[in-house]
Regions:
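Bacterial N-terminal signal peptides that target proteins for export
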Residues: 1-7
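N-terminal secretory targeting modules
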Residues: 17-218, 228-231, 249, 420-434
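Structural recognition of the beta-strand scaffold that forms the well-ordered cores
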Residues: 85, 214-219, 223, 253-259, ...
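Solvent-exposed loop/turn segments at secondary-structure junctions
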Residues: 92, 160-161, 221-225, 260-265, ...
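Glycine- and acidic-residue-enriched helix-capping/strand-helix junction motifs
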Residues: 225-238
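Oxyanion-hole/transition-state-stabilizing segment in secreted/luminal serine hydrolases
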Residues: 228, 260-317
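Catalytic His-Asp segment of secreted/periplasmic serine-dependent ester chemistry enzymes
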Residues: 275, 301-303, 342-434
């Protein structure tokens, strides 16, 4: 074949792979997780005060590299579709990442998949690919009838040493790591070890009708769902997704959780700073129509705690300037932006009265500045009326920073669903303060 003809034919195939089947259909992200790398803790400034209490013991070191192994990663999607594509991430890899094979299937239970649902993924028509360091790779679209709120198994085989693998720490779903070998097509992975993190996987898109769209939930651990019950989907974004799916007027709307536990706005924490990852984790997703921003409490807590160096101090203006940048970027892409107030934190390890003053001022800005298209008042939904600095007793977890399952439900239930579409008469939808 003429070389030029061959190139044009390959381009035509690639273009065909990229297009939804109908002109009115489009790609919408139904599930996502923000990629991150394990970062070393920054050194303590020489002029910082000594801590008044011993530091908490370090968590166990988690395996973060793989060699000749299969990862079966279990995720819970939101809206369904008849075609899908998968995003794999080597964002924080130190070298090119070889993917030997990858499959997607509906999960049955444990590491087992539903018979007949397994599909091999391809990348530009090939069963394997190499992802450059710092990059992502999107699979070719494939046909798979994906119901709403599906448990999906994405299996990825890495034939060689990965080095430190890009991951998302707070997965809150049990996933499986094989012994040596390619088990991507296996109905079940026997003798697998388990993890509550997701490795190498950052998103799933579906082909959906023209009116389908996604809400991006952008934040820190309180958005990530930290301390909620694992394998039950009880983060506030998951619970919001359940409310939307249960309502015929909003069942076409996906909710994508792009929170990172320990994330910060002004500087890197767990994961790069919120502003640094904003384009990738919000603007780079498919079918985004709405954005919820709930982030700043880690900046307040870490920078204003008693042991922080004076040079670390921040003001509410520092925070709002960065949030304003996110709002402007989102609006330039036609995305509506909802601001969420910060939930109480008195009693948390990094609580301070100065920090509480900044939290209150930040919440007042969210409520009254007019910067947002609407406000989700999570503070009002969860605070103790007799002591607004802390959670209501029934929502309070042991660390006084994260709500329990009931608290996350209160947050999700406080959201006015009419912001996303007309509601059936008589249906309670929650509220949105302005």
């Amino acid at each position: 074949m003429n070389p030029r003809v061959a190139i044009l034919a390959a381009m035509a195939v690639s273009f065909a792979f990229a297009q939804p089947p109908n002109a009115t259909d489009h790609w919408v992200t139904t599930w996502g997780a923000s990629p991150q790398a394990r970062l070393a803790a920054p050194p303590r400034p020489a002029n910082a005060q000594a801590p008044t209490a011993p530091a908490a013991p370090a968590p166990p070191v988690q395996v973060t590299s793989f060699n000749n192994q299969t990862l079966r990663l279990i995720v819970h999607t939101t809206i369904g579709g008849r075609r899908l594509r998968v995003h794999l991430s080597n964002d924080f890899g130190l070298a090119p990442l070889k993917i030997g094979a990858a499959h997607v299937a509906l999960r049955s239970k444990g590491s087992a998949v539903v018979e007949g649902s397994d599909r091999a993924l391809s990348f530009n028509g090939q069963p394997s690919c190499t992802i450059p360091a710092g990059a992502q790779m999107i699979s070719d679209p494939l046909d798979l009838e994906l119901p709403p709120a599906a448990n999906v198994a994405v299996s990825v085989y890495v034939p060689g040493e990965t080095g430190p693998a890009t991951y998302h720490g707070t997965g809150l779903h049990t996933s499986y790591i094989s012994k040596a070998g390619d088990f991507t097509a296996a109905p079940e992975i026997a003798e697998a070890t388990t993890t509550q993190s997701w490795f190498l996987l950052s998103g799933i898109d579906v082909v959906a009708p023209a009116d389908a769209a996604a809400i991006m939930a952008f934040g820190d651990s309180i958005t990530d769902g930290a301390t909620s019950t694992p394998d039950t989907d009880r983060s506030w974004p998951s619970l919001l997704a359940q409310r939307l799916l249960a309502n015929p007027a909003t069942a076409h709307i996906a909710v994508v959780n792009e929170g990172i536990s320990g994330n910060r706005v002004l500087r890197d924490g767990q994961g790069v700073s919120a502003l640094a990852r904003f384009d990738r984790d919000v603007l780079g997703q498919s079918g985004v129509k709405w954005l919820v921003i709930m982030e700043s409490i880690n900046d307040i807590g870490q920078s204003l705690r008693a042991t922080a160096a004076p040079s670390d101090a921040i003001t509410v203006g520092d925070l709002t300037a960065v949030i304003h940048q996110m709002i402007e970027r989102a609006r330039a892409h036609g995305i509506k932006v909802f601001g969420a107030t910060l939930t109480p934190y008195e009693g948390a390890a990094y609580y301070s009265e100065k920090g509480e003053e900044v939290r209150a001022a930040y919440n007042q800005w969210v409520r009254t500045s007019g910067e947002f298209d609407a406000v989700f008042d999570f503070d009002a939904a969860t605070r103790d009326t007799s002591n607004p600095k802390t959670f209501r007793a029934e929502y309070n977890l042991r660390d006084h920073l994260h709500p329990n399952d009931a608290g996350y439900k209160a947050m999700a239930d406080s959201i006015d669903l009419s912001l996303f579409g007309p509601q059936p008469a008589g249906r309670a939808t929650g509220s949105a303060a302005r």
